[in-house]
Amino acid sequence: MLYGKENRDEAEFLEPIFGSESEQVDLPKYKLAQQSIEPRVAYQLVQDEMLDEGNARLNLATFCQTYMEPEAVKLMSQTLEKNAIDKSEYPRTTEIENRCVNMIADLWNASEKEKFMGTSTIGSSEACMLGGMAMKFSWRKRAEKLGLDINAKKPNLVISSGYQVCWEKFCIYWDIEMREVPMDKEHMSINLDKVMDYVDEYTIGVVGIMGITYTGRYDDIKALDNLIEEYNKQTDYKVYIHVDAASGGLYAPFVEPELEWDFRLKNVISINTSGHKYGLVYPGVGWVLWRDKKYLPEELIFKVSYLGGELPTMAINFSHSASQLIGQYYNFVRYGFDGYKAIHERTHKVAMFLAKEIEKTGMFEIMNDGSQLPIVCYKLKEDSNRGWNLYDLADRLLMKGWQVPAYPLPKNLENEIIQRLVIRADFGMNMAFNYVQDMQEAIEALNKAHILYHEEPENKTYGFTH
C-alpha cells in the first residue's frame, strides 16, 4: 500500500505507561519526537499499538508461514544484521544460499546433463519478475535472429486469469501485453482447450501456475508442456513455460513426487517458489531457478564490485538480511525430505477434514477440497435461501478471531463469491475442530439473526491476500 497525508489521524495523544505520570510520553505518529525516550517505554508504546491486531495463527487468509521453531528463530535473530549481498564478507552465508539452490534444483528434478542456475529473492514476486525478464530478453534474441520486427507490436505473456498480482505488475513495468486465458466453471485452472489460441510469434512465454491464488488448484503443467511441444514443432518461433510455483513448489515434491510439473518436462525452463509459504520460513524469501544457463540471458547477470570483492548477481533488490536464507537452510537441515513430507501430509489431511465437515452442513458447495494444495474453497449453494452471505459469515467468524477471506473469483466468474481457508503447517487437527465448532455457531447465529437484506450484492473483497 502507498501512504500519504490523507492516511494520518487528526490527533496525537499523551500515553501513560501503566499509569506512571513520570513516564507519560507523547506518542509520535507522523513526525519524529524531539527527544529520546527509554527503550522500555518505547517498546511498550509500540507493543500497545499492535494490541488489537489479529492473531497470525488464526489468519486463514495468508499463505505465509506463521510459526517457526525457537531454534530457527534464534539463528535468524543472530544473522539479522548480515547483508546477504555482501558475498565476500559473508562467504559462509553465500555457500548456504548455494546449497539451498542446489537442494531445490534436486527437488525439481534438474538434469545432471544441464547447468541449472538459480538465486534467492525476497519473495516470489521478485522471483516472477526475474523469470519474466529472462523470458522477455530470450524471446527478443530469438525474434531478432529470425528477422521478426520486435517493434511492430507489444510482446505478450499468456497466463490463466487466476494469476497472482505480481504478473500484472510485471506486464505493466516491462510493457508486456498480458493475455489472460479465462477461467470458467468447467475450467478452474488454465483452459487447455483455449490456451494455445493466445500464443503467437510475439509470445515471450506461457506461465503455468502450481497453486492458483483464488482456489489452490494446479494447472496441468504436463498437458501444457505437450501442447507447447506440438506448437514448437510447427514453428521457428519457440515458446517455453515458466512455472509459478509460489505455493506448490515446496509442497508438491513431497506430497505428490510422481506429479510431473517441473524440469522433467522439456519446455519448462524456469520455476519460482516462495520459501515463506510451504518452505516453512517466515516472510520473506523466494527462489527462482532456470533449467540451464542458456535460458538466463547474460545481460541480466551483473558483476558488481562491492566492498573488496566481485560478485555475479541477478536481483531487483540489492541489500537484504541473510536471516531468511539461514531460516530456509535450517529447515532443510532440520526436516529433511521425510520431515517435510510428514508435515505437508498432515496439513493435507487437515484440509481434507475441513472440506468434508463444511460439506456436511449442507449449505456449501466445495470448490476445492484440498486434494492438491491444502486450500479449502467453498461457496453458498444457489438454493440455500439464506438471508446472509459469505461476507456476513466472515464477520461472525472474526468475532472468534478467525480471519477468513470472502471474495469474488476472477474475470468471467466475478459473480461467484467464495471463501478460502489456507491450511498451513501450524494449523493442526485440534484447531480444525475448533474452527468447525466456531463456524457452526456462527451459522446458527446468522440463521437466527434478523438481518437487513442486502439490497444489491456487493462483490467486494474481504480479507483476501495473495
From Swiss-Prot:
A molecular-function term among this protein's GO annotations: aromatic-L-amino-acid decarboxylase activity
Biophysicochemical property: temperature dependence: Active up to 70 degrees Celsius at pH 4.1.
pH effect summary: Optimum pH is 4.7. Active at acidic pHs but inactive in the neutral pH range.
Pfam family, one: Pyridoxal_deC
PTM annotation (N6-(pyridoxal phosphate)lysine): residues: 277
Entries under InterPro entries matching the protein: Glutamate_decarboxylase, PyrdxlP-dep_de-COase, PyrdxlP-dep_Trfase, PyrdxlP-dep_Trfase_major
Cofactor list: pyridoxal 5'-phosphate
Catalytic activity line of the entry: L-glutamate + H(+) = 4-aminobutanoate + CO2
Family matches, as SUPFAM superfamilies: PLP-dependent transferases
Keyword Translocase: no
EC number: 4.1.1.15
Keywords: Decarboxylase, Lyase, Pyridoxal phosphate
GO CC annotation terms, alphabetical: cytosol
GO biological process per UniProt: glutamate catabolic process
Primary enzyme class: lyase
Family the UniProt entry places it in: Belongs to the group II decarboxylase family.
Annotated function: Converts internalized glutamate to GABA and increases the internal pH. Involved in glutamate-dependent acid resistance.
Name this polypeptide is given: Glutamate decarboxylase
